[in-house]
Amino acid sequence: MFKFKASDLPEILTRWSARYSVFVPSGSPDNAQMRIWSRRTRKEVRFMEPDEYTNLIVAPKGFVFGEREELFRWGGHEKTCTALSAPYSSSLQEEDKILCGLRPCDTYGLAYMDRFFLGEHHDINYHWRRQHVFIVAVNCLEAGPECYCASMGTGPFAEITAHTEYGMQAGKGDGRLRTPDYGPDHKKGEKGENDWYWVEAGSDRGKALLSHVAPLLYRDLEFTGRRRKKALQEDALKTFRRTLDTSTVRQVLAAHFKDEEWDAIASSCIACTGCTRVCPTCTCFTTEEEQDTPHSGTRVRVWDSCQSVSFTRNAEFH
């Protein structure tokens, strides 16, 4: 386990930016968004401290699941059509990215998408994007007023799981810099004594990130770091204002399936699909043909919403 001074964080981000495209939370507490960090932009893009924001205003899934992405181009003649390019030969040529400052709940959202796109039906486009993304997750020392991740097992601290190859975690006061198989690459905690970040690498990719900033790291005693982490985690669990018993969710939903309350909620819906666009686990998409000429075009995949009538009809009658 390692630690580094909080005052060295800008330099660590700058050193990473020499090799990767580094994105950090920036903005205001109620409008935190991922913005690119570099030596050139560091004066305009300020990395928000972990205690300055509860979470990003938009889930980070767009970094691995493009809102619009090309599947392949096609062309031919009146009776013959041939695919002309693979997805990774055109729109998916991109640099390695570090997403620094993700909350544990969002890392679990990405882990869910990993299982969906990289499971039985392996999605080439998703895999291509995912392998270029490192995740630096920041542990939460205080729950937000609407948070209930502890009840879902998705926070307030991120944990390494078997499906996390491209993840990492770190933290100020407690944290881990780690890169598992498809998940958080680096985990950061929060403010601790004398403003230190505790970090721990969890894979070879995470170790590589640490090696780039080795001169700024201090080795910490494993026992001391883990004991401190446990204490911080226990304190964080005491800050939750909302809890949810998930053991009976299925029975409760089934018992209230026809309640009038659902009609009252639905009456305010204007079918904007904004709910699924910000949902960190929505994997819904549809495909479209963008025709260039009568005999050539591009097949693209775009986000769709499982809450729209047309999506339900397509899924039912396809």
Task: List where the protein language model places each region.
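Short cysteine clusters
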Residues: 105, 149, 269-275, 279-282, ...
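Ferredoxin-type iron-sulfur electron-transfer modules in oxidoreductases and energy-metabolism complexes
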Residues: 244-267, 285-318
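A general structural signal for well-ordered secondary-structure junctions
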Residues: 19-22, 275, 312
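Histidine- and/or cysteine-centered catalytic micro-motif in compact active-site loops
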Residues: 204, 274, 280-287, 311
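Iron-sulfur-associated redox domains of electron-transfer enzymes in respiratory
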Residues: 1-254, 260-262, 280, 296
